Amino acid sequence: MTDQIARNEKQLGAILRRARRQRGLSQGSLGQLIHKRQATVSRLEAGEPAVQLHTLMEVLSALRLELVIRPRSQAHADIEDAF
């Protein structure tokens, strides 16, 4: 999986959904790995903002992914500031 950028909850959810599918996992099986319900995985993948940070970190670990924080590129920041 190549580096991907998520600038909002929905983009992050889509990235996690692709990663889960690439690993051949259903939402239910991922939920079992992190001891959460399938509905919790579904909410995270849908970009619902109420999902706890701890749950996000568990999902990242189960999918063998990591969170990287870096400065936003200026071009994207300028475009988003326009809206």
Q: Which positions does each model-derived feature cover?
A:
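DNA major-groove recognition helix of helix-turn-helix/homeodomain DNA-binding modules
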Residues: Q52-R70
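Short, charged recognition helix plus adjacent turn
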Residues: I69-F83
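A short, Lys/Arg-rich alpha-helix, primarily the initiator
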Residues: M1-Q22
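Short alpha-helical DNA-recognition segment
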Residues: G24-S42
